Amino acid sequence: MPIVKVAEVARKNVDYVIIGGGTSGLVAAVRLSEDPSVTVLVLEAGQDNLGDPKIDVPLQLGHTFRNPQYDWAFMTTKQKNANDREILWSRGKGLGGSSAINFYVWIKPPAADIDALEKLGNPGWNWANYEKYSKKAETFHLPTTEQTDLYPHTFDLKARGTSGPVQVAIPAHVHTLDKLFQETMVNKGLKAINDPYSGDINGTWIASSTLDPRTWTRSSSATAYLVPNISRSNLKVLTGALVSRIIFDPATADRERTATAVKFIHGDAIYEVNVDKEVILCAGTINSPQILELSGIGQPEVLSRVGIDVEIDLPGVGENLQEHVSTSTIYELDPGSSHETWDLMRDPEYAAEAKALYAAGKGMQRSGLTSFSYFPLSLVNPEESRVLIDRLEAEVDAQPSQ
């Protein structure tokens, strides 16, 4: 079993140390450990949380937010355009990373966005390759006739994977409001997308979820990749291990700086593990650059301010962070409405009944977020859209030539 005690890895030598047991870290660990001749260690700051109903049961989504057992709960600096508020930025903490706490929506970007990466000078980063490997990760479970009769859900099997580790399905419990929302969007002029996983999401559509319909539990990177390979003797996972620094050998005339060890905090003590081949940093958007900077890799001006010796001058570390914004608009239904919503779960008696139904493979606990519409601002406010485009084009034109 790869989840080990700290004494089993401290001061030991391993071939690969992977920092972070989220999605990228666990996928890398499982792929590397396919070679039985190498040893792989994953250091994860959070806990394993395997079998935890707050993660596994679909309608428990949101219960993990701000909870330090599951969520890093980062807070931004004060945001000028958000009335100087500090905004919560939830990131998964524990095996599976954010795939263990997100809203389990299976979603893919537009093909044009991926192809743009290749056009910027990254050969191979194109939609054709992205589609190939994203399908390889997925097993899409066909919906039942009952689901398709109730849901405005269509799909194209050519865009779906059939033998990957991540289980993908249509949530079993449906809401009449989802169907009405889709019909309303079409009536407003949006096209209904046959399958949003084909590279075109500009319209209105029903999403699939990372749920395993055999158990109606979440399919995270921990359950999809780690659990099926948990018996590999050359794969070890240490949870509760907060990495504080990557240690390097000095550069020589024959080679560049080489990572030789990783220092981490476990409990109240500091430990090291030695690395024979590579350190692979998969600690996420926030923690990865932080670990690099703590290791002396980054902008000298930033490092010197906090007393960190510069190992490698790499000014891009920790810069150019961007994130999309989430805002909510809430509408109350007429008290006499027959539409069923998640508000019913606020009633302890109903919640207890739903829990019992879930144990029998029935009921609202098998719900998910499914209705989506993507459309340009020009569809609803062409005047404001034109103003924004003109402003952005002017800003681009004002930039000095490179």
Where are these regions (language model features)?
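N-terminal redox-cofactor-binding region of secreted/periplasmic oxidoreductases
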Residues: 1-402
